[in-house]
């Protein structure tokens, strides 16, 4: 009887331990939590670690958290294990690391190698499976060696863009230059190398040192023997983009679209209705123009109007203008041809190159009435209100969807009312999502961004607290004509400055 009791006790104990083990496994966090006390030490111990810079109030961070944890769990069993970590970059004690790594929005992920000596932006997916696949590739060699025809077929494939270096030996200046570029661009491009060009699946055998870039479009492969660092990088980047990038709903085209918009070249974009009667004729003529201008530092894209709503919103375009061509230069000047016809494409490009096409400015209409305390500025009125008015102007660049901008609006109204009897001061706002901004004067990377331009033209960014009294003090200090006295100041707002919303990109 005693034995049976002991047996029952043993079974219960084992079950308890088993359940406890399961619960422990369920509650275990695989993402390392870093702060100012352990950040440097932890990074220095890892040859490869990913760090998420986040803020607790950031909605995108909250959405990423469970996917990041799932990925960390799976990668913990990788050989060798890959570490994922996070740090609250909004915490005052941790802000030194946010500054060190130039964090401008949340979440931002960085890949740190060699104990933090090498830093790379994470540009991969934001769901668990994609994170795992991306990081497994990133943790491997920057360039894989091809030792057989079978391995070459596997690496190059039919749909991959791969730069393959061919060398007589795996050493020397050319090899070192190639490997350095592979390491630099490993996040966005695939690299391989071989001692025998006969393994390569396409093209005649090439004598090394040389680089053959394989691609599933246009001429299918292209060679280069220039191993100068800048020239080699330019070759890889430019050769990896189709002569004419296609922007539609096909996910296979999306990586090329991303590379197109990342290119520093002048970008020519034609948007048409792909199912329209003249679509094929338009695309054919556009490709002819692209072919004849391929050496003119122009990148070409043709987009289906139905799949390009984001581009339409960004450039301020209307569907009634389709088919259209818009050109964007590296200094952000834009040139627009709306309702273009087949026989106008070639001549319009010639006019553009001859400097005969006027710059297009994205702008909302100038408001018929502008009687509110905070004056509405649009691109077309920016010169008159800000640059040529001879006034001291505090201007907010905002986005309608930005929560911080919405909270700031009533405060700026109060500031404007306090200066209503001072004709030398203007408090203004501009919707930066609907109007072009002169980037050489105003550097707008997040919302809200606030600038002050004095009556004589001195421009300074506002970096103070977002309270009525702080704004008033700032304007009085920087104005070149002393404003009159103002009303009683309100109590300071407790809302801290945050930059979850970023203008340059959607963090997810």
UniProtKB/Swiss-Prot annotation:
Positions of glycan attachment: 38, 273
Function of the protein: Acts as a protein-folding catalyst that interacts with nascent polypeptides to catalyze the formation, isomerization, and reduction or oxidation of disulfide bonds.
GO cellular component, one term: mitochondrion
NCBIfam families: ER_PDI_fam, pdi_dom
MF GO annotations: protein disulfide isomerase activity
Chain residue ranges for the region called Disordered: 474-508
Keyword match Endoplasmic reticulum: yes
Protein's name in the database: Protein disulfide isomerase-like 1-2
Site for Lowers pKa of C-terminal Cys of second active site, residues: 466
Keyword Translocase attached: no
Site feature location: Lowers pKa of C-terminal Cys of first active site: 126
């Amino acid at each position: 009887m005693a034995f049976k009791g002991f047996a029952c006790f043993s079974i219960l104990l084992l079950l308890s331990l088993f359940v406890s083990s399961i619960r422990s496994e369920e509650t275990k966090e695989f993402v390392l939590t870093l702060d100012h006390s352990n950040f440097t030490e932890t990074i220095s111990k890892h040859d490869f670690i990913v760090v998420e810079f986040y803020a607790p109030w950031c909605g995108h961070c909250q959405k990423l958290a469970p996917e990041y944890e799932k990925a960390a769990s799976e990668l913990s069993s990788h050989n060798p294990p890959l570490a994922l970590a996070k740090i609250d970059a909004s915490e005052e004690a941790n802000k030194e690391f946010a500054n060190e790594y130039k964090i401008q929005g949340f979440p931002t992920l960085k890949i740190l190698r060699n104990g933090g000596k090498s830093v790379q932006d994470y540009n991969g997916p934001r769901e668990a499976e994609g994170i795992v696949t991306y990081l497994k590739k990133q943790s491997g060699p920057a360039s894989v060696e091809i030792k057989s025809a079978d391995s070459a077929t596997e690496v190059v494939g039919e749909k991959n863009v791969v730069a393959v270096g061919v060398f007589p030996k795996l050493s020397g200046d050319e090899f070192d230059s190639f490997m350095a570029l592979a390491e630099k661009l490993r996040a966005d491009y695939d690299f391989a190398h071989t001692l025998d060009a006969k393994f390569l699946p396409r093209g005649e055998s090439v004598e090394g040192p040389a680089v053959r870039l394989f691609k599933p479009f246009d001429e299918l492969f292209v060679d280069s023997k220039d191993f100068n660092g800048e020239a080699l990088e330019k070759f890889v980047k430019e050769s990896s983009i189709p002569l004419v990038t296609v922007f539609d709903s096909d996910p296979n085209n999306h990586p090329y679209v991303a590379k197109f918009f990342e290119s520093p070249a002048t970008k020519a974009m034609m948007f048409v209705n792909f199912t329209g009667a003249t679509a094929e004729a338009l695309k054919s003529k556009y490709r002819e123009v692209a072919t004849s201008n391929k050496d003119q530092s122009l990148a070409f894209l043709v987009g289906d109007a139905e799949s390009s709503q984001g581009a339409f919103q960004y450039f301020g375009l209307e569907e009634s203008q389709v088919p259209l061509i818009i050109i964007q230069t590296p200094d952000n000047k834009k040139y627009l041809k709306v309702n273009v016809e087949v026989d106008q494409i070639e001549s319009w490009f010639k006019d553009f190159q001859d400097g005969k096409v006027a710059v297009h400015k994205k702008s909302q209409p100038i408001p018929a009435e502008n009687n509110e305390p905070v004056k509405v500025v649009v691109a077309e009125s920016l010169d008159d209100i800000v640059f040529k008015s001879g006034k001291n102007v505090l201007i907010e660049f905002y986005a309608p969807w930005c929560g911080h901008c919405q909270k700031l609006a009533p405060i700026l109204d109060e500031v404007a009312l306090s200066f209503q009897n001072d004709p030398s001061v203007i408090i203004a706002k501009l919707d930066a999502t609907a109007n072009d901004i002169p980037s050489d004067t105003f550097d707008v990377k997040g919302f809200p961004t606030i600038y002050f331009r004095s009556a004589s033209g001195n421009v300074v960014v506002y970096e103070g607290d977002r309270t009525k009294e702080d704004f008033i003090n700032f304007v009085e200090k920087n104005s070149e004509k002393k404003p009159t006295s103002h009303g009683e100041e309100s109590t300071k707002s407790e809302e801290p400055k945050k930059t979850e919303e970023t203008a340059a990109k959607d963090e997810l």
